């Protein structure tokens, strides 16, 4: 029962990866439109696009970290909140 709940929780945590992918697509779409309008600002706009990409990707990495924590880190705790297998 607990394993199923952890799998559902990890799956829900990875939904943020889809949002990050949409955000990255929006960042580079805006970059292409902006460079097409004003090619002389291409270098400056590319720097802003890389910053936007990094921040969007950070959300996906945090979601992946949370999914791994849900799946693997919480298995070491018993029902009483103490480490499983630790001396009492």
Swiss-Prot record:
Catalytic reaction equation(s): ATP + H2O + 4 H(+)(in) = ADP + phosphate + 5 H(+)(out)
Keyword list, A-Z: ATP-binding, CF(0), Hydrogen ion transport, Ion transport, Lipid-binding, Membrane, Mitochondrion, Nucleotide-binding, Translocase, Transmembrane, Transmembrane helix, Transport
Chain coiled-coil ranges: none
Protein's UniProt keywords contain Nucleotide-binding: yes
Known EC number: 7.1.2.2
Entries under Pfam families matching the protein: ATP-synt_C
Site keyed Reversibly protonated during proton transport: positions: 57
Transmembrane regions: 8-28, 45-72
UniProt GO MF annotations: ATP binding; lipid binding; proton transmembrane transporter activity
InterPro entries associated with the record: ATP_synth_F0_csu (IPR000454), ATP_synth_F0_csu_DDCD_BS (IPR020537), ATP_synth_F0_csu_sf (IPR038662), ATPase_proteolipid_c-like_dom (IPR002379), F/V-ATP_Csub_sf (IPR035921)
Chief subcellular location: mitochondrion
A single BP term in Gene Ontology: proton motive force-driven ATP synthesis
Subcellular location(s) per record: Mitochondrion membrane
Topology term for the membrane: Multi-pass membrane protein
Any GO CC annotation of this UniProt entry: proton-transporting two-sector ATPase complex, proton-transporting domain
Family of this protein: Belongs to the ATPase C chain family.
HAMAP family: ATP_synth_c_bact
Function, as annotated: This protein is one of the chains of the nonenzymatic membrane component (F0) of mitochondrial ATPase.
Quaternary assembly: F-type ATPases have 2 components, CF(1) - the catalytic core - and CF(0) - the membrane proton channel. CF(1) has five subunits: alpha(3), beta(3), gamma(1), delta(1), epsilon(1). CF(0) has three main subunits: a, b and c.
Name of the molecule in the record: ATP synthase subunit 9, mitochondrial
Native source organism of the sequence: Beta vulgaris (Sugar beet)
């Amino acid at each position: 029962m607990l394993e199923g709940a952890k799998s559902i929780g990890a799956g829900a945590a990875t939904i943020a990866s889809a949002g990050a992918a949409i955000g990255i697509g929006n960042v580079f779409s805006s970059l292409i439109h902006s460079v097409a309008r004003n090619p002389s600002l291409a270098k400056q706009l590319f720097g802003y696009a890389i910053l936007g990409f990094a921040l969007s990707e950070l959300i996906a990495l945090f979601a992946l970290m949370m999914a791994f924590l849900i799946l693997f880190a919480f298995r070491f705790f018993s029902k009483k909140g103490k480490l499983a297998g630790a001396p009492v």
